[in-house]
Amino acid sequence: TAVELIEAGYNVVIVDDLSNSNIKVLEGLKKITGVLPAFEQIDLKDKDATQKVFEKYPDIDGIIHFAASKAVGESVKEPLLYYRNNVVSLINLLELMPQYGVKGIIFSSSCTVYGQPLPENLPVTEEAPHQKATSPYGNTKEINEQIIYDYIHSGASLKSIILRYFNPIGAHPSALIGELPNGVPNNLIPYVTQTAMGIRKELTIFGNDYNTPDGTCIRDYIYVVDLAKAHVTAMSRVLDDEKSPALDYFNIGTGKGNSTLEIVKTFEHATGVKVNWKYGPRREGDIEKIWGNCTKANSVLGWKAETPLSDVLASAWKWQQRLREEGMM
């Protein structure tokens, strides 16, 4: 996202506590863009530290807020960690934004707010009824959406676009930046690439008895670079389009669903590398199948996911190879 923003002419300040990333990402950003963005290592739950960022950079116009804990399985085991991190950080930002004249916030929500959609509601539109969240992670996204809605409807002087991501995957095509999970990855693709590399002994596919064509879960996998382009178009709409509503919602996905098994097989075909995998029991909190109807983002934002799945998975493998070469994993 920082790359796309810089290339679109924005001045970028990155704020991260590095709990699930690495400072070396900044080097990759500079190699790609020629610009070393400003960086502040703070925890957004610390309101005083967050306020100092606004004081240090008084010209901030907009915020893209995706600092959050994001693993469904972990959230079931550590619910309070998720509620504290994901909810408190947003409240701190919303309280500080008007004080410093920040006009808009793009919020990273999730398709988890739809829960397990009824079959007749697939692919889900933004108007699809919200089902009960299947995990604390999903519930934090639902709560945060409601907080933003309530705050804006109270008359707060800011605008927001809520982006409901489906499943972001892949790495920048340069292989200079990508996902850097600390410890055991909670997301599918890093686990696939680490298993293919031999770092992990085997990949477990959680559940093969779902009501899907091959029995494994179905998700809508969106390339991170395509997603980053959506961030830029959303930010432009919030900051520059005076006619845009104070609050709007968009699904950000491909409009297609792929099963976990399809992901593994497509990865093997795209890279020529075999993955050692096995079936395991279902994982608590996982939904069976979901994919998005993204025509609203196509028409209103002028945005569409364009990268083929095989290219996305190849980018993830190229990134994993670079991590090995650099001794980072």
Predicted regions and their residues:
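C-terminal substrate-binding subdomain of Rossmann-fold SDR/epimerase-dehydratase oxidoreductases
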Residues: I189-M329
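N-terminal Rossmann-like NAD(P)+-binding domain of SDR-like oxidoreductases, especially those catalyzing
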Residues: T1-A171
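Short-chain dehydrogenase/reductase
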Residues: Y83, A133-E142, G178-N186, P190, ...
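Short, basic/glycine-rich phosphate-binding loops at helix/coil junctions
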Residues: G170-H172, D209-Y210
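Short capping/connector residues at structural and topological boundaries
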Residues: K77, P119, E127-P129, E142, ...
